[in-house]
Design a protein with these regions (language model features):
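Active-site-adjacent segment of FAD-dependent monooxygenases/related oxidoreductases
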Residues: 1-51, 55-56, 60-62, 66-82, ...
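Conserved mid-domain beta->alpha element of the FAD-binding
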Residues: 45, 149, 259, 265-316
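Hydrophobic residues embedded in beta-strands of well-ordered beta-sheets
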Residues: 83, 210-212, 281-282
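Short, solvent-exposed loop/helix junctions and linker helices
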Residues: 35-39, 235, 300-303
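Eukaryotic short linear interaction motifs
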Residues: 67-69, 75-76, 93-94, 156-157, ...
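Conserved FAD-binding catalytic core of PHBH/FMO-like flavoproteins
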Residues: 47, 51, 57, 120-133, ...
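Surface-exposed beta-strand-to-loop junctions
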Residues: 21-27, 212-222, 285
Length: 316
């Protein structure tokens, strides 16, 4: 991605391209931004782990922790293994994310709602199901010097430690569509920030295989008492998200030939009450800090806690 197109309403409220600017400051780096599929990025990490560990370290999937204990009597002993974690291996069926019943033309579309903050935390249900499923009766007991919890905003590790995320949500819900678009919008294959007069905003990111990702502002939420504003996700479907995008991008037309994936989430800004327990168990990423996605620094900051911790942990 070399440029960003900025679209705003003119003095008559009609959507126009107001400017086109470099995606990054010219000359700041010999690198430029690119869009890569998450699977490709994970493959780079997996290959590097295998290479530099000489095949001794691998990433296991379909594994869920069921208990975490810290022996506080030995946390000051540098040679001790004070952390005990029980791991249970899930069956293939249990490990498969639950999808909503939404379908397009009779085909169920993969969605990311199972990890969205609009969905309830189902970790306890997964643990219970794993304990009852005979196919998933393999249990590991792991003794560790250190532990890094990078398990997202619903972090099981954070809850086991008794830490909380402090802050609040905004009143906005954002939907995400990965589509092969049908549109007369001229900059659909460019990175765009589109702001309408009254209907919200859309961010456009071109992807591989003719796909385009749209981040679409949906609506506000209701606040009940002193609680954070929360959303009822039952009404959120791909059609609702698409209709919001169509209103924002009018008078340009938008539909799609293929819907590849979708999700929705409520944006907020929170930070954990603590980042570590006894300097033995550490939290990283969304497990300990969540941000409004509209800030570019979010994408750079989220991995930094892990990057900073990893070199230190491998040396002890």
């Amino acid at each position: 991605m070399l440029e960003i197109s900025l679209w705003n309403p003119d003095e008559k409220g009609v959507l126009r391209r107001s400017s086109r600017i470099p995606d990054t400051i010219p000359g700041i780096s010999r690198f430029q931004q690119v869009v890569l599929h998450q699977g490709r990025i994970e493959r780079f990490f997996l290959d590097a782990i295998n290479e530099f560990s000489e095949g001794k370290v691998s990433v296991e999937r379909g594994v869920i922790p069921t208990s975490l204990e810290i022996n506080e009597k030995t946390v000051e002993d540098a040679d001790a293994y004070p952390i005990t974690v029980n791991l249970r291996h899930l069956s293939e069926e249990e490990a498969r994310p639950k999808q909503t019943a939404t379908s397009v033309n009779g085909t169920v579309i993969q969605d990311g709602l199972f990890r969205s903050n609009l969905s309830p935390d189902d970790t306890a249900e997964m643990i219970k199901a794993a304990e009852l499923n005979q196919k998933a009766d393999t249990v590991e007991v792991v003794k560790a010097k250190y532990m890094l919890g990078a398990d997202g905003a619903h972090s099981w590790v954070r809850k086991e430690l008794g830490f909380k995320l402090e802050g609040e949500s905004t009143d906005y819900i954002w939907g995400v569509l990965d589509i092969v678009p049908i549109t007369d919008f001229p900059d659909i294959r460019m990175r765009c920030a589109i702001h309408s007069a009254n209907s919200g905003s859309v961010m456009v990111i071109p992807r591989e295989n003719k796909l385009v990702r749209l981040y679409i502002q949906l609506t506000t939420t209701e606040k009940i008492g002193d609680q954070d504003s929360r959303a009822d996700r039952s009404w959120i479907t791909p059609d609702v998200i698409l209709e919001s995008a169509q209103r924002i991008m009018a008078p340009y037309k938008l539909s799609y030939r293929k819907l590849d994936w979708w999700t929705a989430y409520q944006i907020g800004q929170r930070v954990g009450s603590s980042f570590s327990a006894h300097e033995r168990v550490f939290l990283a990423g969304d497990a300990v800090h969540t941000h409004r996605f509209v800030s570019r620094s979010v994408f750079a900051f989220r991995p930094l806690t892990s990057y900073c911790a990893a070199p230190k942990l491998v040396r002890v």
